[in-house]
Amino acid sequence: MQRLIPIAFSSSVKGFVRRHYLLLERGNNPETSLSRSFSGASHHHHYRERLRNELHCIKFDDAFSLFCEMLQSRPIPSIVDFTRVLTVIAKMNKFDIVIYLYHKMENLGISHDLYSFTILIHCFCRCSRLSLALALLGKMMKLGFRPSIVTLGSLLNGFCQGNRFQEAVSLVDSMDGFGFVPNVVIYNTVINGLCKNRDLNNALEVFYCMEKKGIRADAVTYNTLISGLSNSGRWTDAARLLRDMVKRKIDPNVIFFTALIDTFVKEGNLLEARNLYKEMIRRSVVPNVFTYNSLINGFCIHGCLGDAKYMFDLMVSKGCFPDVVTYNTLITGFCKSKRVEDGMKLFCEMTYQGLVGDAFTYNTLIHGYCQAGKLNVAQKVFNRMVDCGVSPDIVTYNILLDCLCNNGKIEKALVMVEDLQKSEMDVDIITYNIIIQGLCRTDKLKEAWCLFRSLTRKGVKPDAIAYITMISGLCRKGLQREADKLCRRMKEDGFMPSERIYDETLRDHYTSLSAELIKAAHE
């Protein structure tokens, strides 16, 4: 009988199995309970029927029940039938469960075949248990099984996911010994892993190695390398590969162009991004919504709203319909440039087109109107948000609270915070900082101090801003001793103000102890 290596199973796997078997014992699975009363032949027929009719749409619990039913069948089903069920469970990403079930099979003396070993190795790799996968590979080879290209591919993916690239490259080099010639997919797996790990020199070395062996790189190879090089600012190398790609008549597709445009945008290289867009059009590659969103986002980030709006209009004229991300990007750009009315026009257009704004959309507009000093309009946008069924989040309330406090409406802000505390929403330190600052600004130091002292009781830990705000408030009132105590407590909690915060907040009010602590923090 084949014996697999001993495995320690996680508590979650043990818990699931325990609960499942309890249900079976209590008879909560009528299908399984009914099957127990059948004869062996009837039971055999029942699971075979389920294998034939249910596997294509089976749910996880049902697949697990089917496996248990098969274990009880006599004669015991073949390894092929067991593997069919376990393949389905593995596709549900229940890798620990698959490993557990294989050991249940082993305990019944069911011998594994190449395919079942391969699935088990795949599951070990996906669970980041590479040492067990390698031990199992050795075990199966001792039993006379020769690994397939799928087996080796699973190991290769496992090495790359575990950042064990030397072993990945060694595995590729040794594939000839197993009778397999690594193809472009195998090399792409290694190159992709190296690029994600920013090990670009080794990625290029693997690329040149595959070229020497006569394996032609494809669009995926070039896309991975060029994106990785561009993300690391190696524009010369990226451009050289791009020229090489074009020379070989490997046509870049929309995904390739979009990824590269997005990289240039993130690097702030808008000229190259725009040129790539023109190259797409020249090559008759049709840009998609992601392409336009990347370009519009880049123009908005760098304050080129005219270019962003032009690209938006061009997008529409070419029959590519903007999505919520497109509108949110433009609305944010307009609001940051203090053109909130233009942002609102876009919001109305978006609604007219049948798109529903999300919390981000409304938060952007509310913030824009608050910054413009139009609290009443911000309140109307908030009301519309609620009426449209979009739930305000803590960011929404923080924006409104900040606006109320900045406009001297501290009483309204306090009522809103009280309502928030009664709701199920988690009130964060940012919320309390806004209120504490508002109270200090309106000479309500006593109320601010009470709120500050209650934070720990509310399960919220004060941060540096909370401390600085209170120390500044105490200093302005001439309460030097209390300020010194709080400064000492701030240091004990591991917070020290930056030089900028000190300059802006404490310089005019510092006490001797405050000055000493701050000086020590920056030596």
UniProtKB/Swiss-Prot annotation:
Presence of the UniProt keyword Repeat in the record: yes
Parts forming coiled coils: none
Pfam families with a match to the protein in the record: PPR, PPR_2
Repeat (PPR) residue spans along the chain: 43-77, 78-112, 113-147, 148-182, 183-217, 218-252, 253-287, 288-322, 323-357, 358-392, 393-427, 428-462, 463-497
Domain of life: Eukaryota
S-S bridge residues: none
Family as reported in the entry's similarity comment: Belongs to the PPR family. P subfamily.
NCBIfam families (alphabetical): PPR
Name by which UniProt lists this protein: Pentatricopeptide repeat-containing protein At1g64580
Lineage of source species: Eukaryota, Viridiplantae, Streptophyta, Embryophyta, Tracheophyta
